[in-house]
């Protein structure tokens, strides 16, 4: 691993965590959690943050793959490649709604419909990141700090449990929201930052 890769992986881990937190803050505090459809006031901001989150996640996955030797750890290598594709899909849909809303050309779908298409992939994205975290933790040989492993397992258990339960309608909305906040907005950014810290010391 080159020094440039180490620097990029470390910085992008922080960028990813910050983008996730900033996006949630805008949605929760400015747009409102009950809002439906593309928001013409803040939609561009959340779309750009989603694009940044996808790009930074792709960078972290590639560098982390070298740190945890994805070529010799099959399931970790597999999930790394799957999550890289998921991150690309995040980028693909990241600014699509805003681009559609501001397009000078006629479109078959409006911005809200484009946003809904991207949202339809969210369930699998969470599952993919959860399985990626689990595969990384399974091959970690002491590189991650103790707190990083703790928040990592917390994230994995919450996100996979919640997504599996929601698939069959077993998680009520009143419970899903706090699980989402704890797992996706607190534990995930902390875990990805711990990965960045490990990259910087490798």
Name what the model sees in each region:
Residues 1-202:
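Hydrophobic, aromatic-enriched alpha-helical segments typical of multi-pass transmembrane helices
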